[in-house]
C-alpha cells in the first residue's frame, strides 16, 4: 500500500537519498534501438525489466510489430515486455497517434475484447517475450470506454496467466483510477509531462505533481508502479504559457547538455523538482530548456519509494546517463 505523510514539513529542496528498495525497468524504443541497447548493456545490473516499444496497428487494425525490434533479447535473465500502443497507420504511411476510436471498437463487446486479447497474446508468444504492457492513451475521459477497458484488463489478465505471461497496464495522469480494474496486473502511472510541448517552460514533474499522483494511485488494486521520464523539453520564444511561442520539442539529456555547452549556459537546479534548467539566445530568439539528470531521477524515485512505491519505470533508454541511479 502507499503511505502518504502529512503534517508540517519544511520544504527542503527535493533531493535523492536512501529509500526503501525499488525495482527498475525501462523501455527500448524502435527508433533508437542501437543507442538504447548500448545504454542497457552498460547498466545491465540496474534493470529488473525491459519493455520493447512498441507494437501498434496497421491500416486494417491488425497488430504490427516493428522490424527494428525483431530479435532483440537483452543479455541476462531480465524479463522482457512487449508494449502495445494505440497508434494506427493510415493509407499512405501516416500514423494516427493515440487513436481512441480504434480502442473503442476493439473493446466494444465481450466478443471483440476476447479477440483483441487473443491477438495480443498470440503476438507476445510469437515474439517470445515474458510479459505484455498495454499503453492505450487518450481514452480516460470516456466513461463507457473505461468500463470496457476494465473488463478488458480482467480478460487479458486471465488469458495471460494461462499463457504464463505477466501483464502491466500503463495509465496516464488524467486517467480515473477509482474504477473496477482487474487486481492481477501491475499498474504503471505516468508521472511526467507536467510541462512539455503543450505548455510553457517547466519540469516534467515536481514534488506537488508526484505527491498528487501518489494520492490518486491509492484507489488502484494490486501492484502499483511509478513511471518517470528522462530528458526534457526546449521552448522557443515562450510567452503566455507557451501559447504564442515558437517551436517546442522534447529533447534527451545528452542533447540538453550539448545545448548548454554550445551556448555557454550554466544549468541551475530547481528546488521543487530537482530538474535542471537554463536559457540562451540565438538568432534573435530566446530559448528555455528544462531537463532531468540522474540526480533528478534519484530525487523522484526517493519521493515515490518513501511513500510506498516499490516499482519504478524510466522512460527511456537512449541519450541519458543511467549510471548512479539508486535502487535503495
Predicted regions and their residues:
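Glycan-recognition patch characteristic of GH18 chitinases/ENGases
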Residues: 11-116
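Substrate-binding surface in catalytic domains of secreted glycosidases
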Residues: 29, 55, 59-67, 147-259
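Short, acidic/polar
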Residues: 29-45, 110-125, 172-178, 292-305
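Glycan-binding loop/region signatures in secreted carbohydrate-active enzymes
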Residues: 89-103, 230-300
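Active-site groove signature of glycoside hydrolases
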Residues: 115-147, 187-193
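Extracellular low-complexity, Gly/Ser/Thr-rich intrinsically disordered linkers
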Residues: 279-327
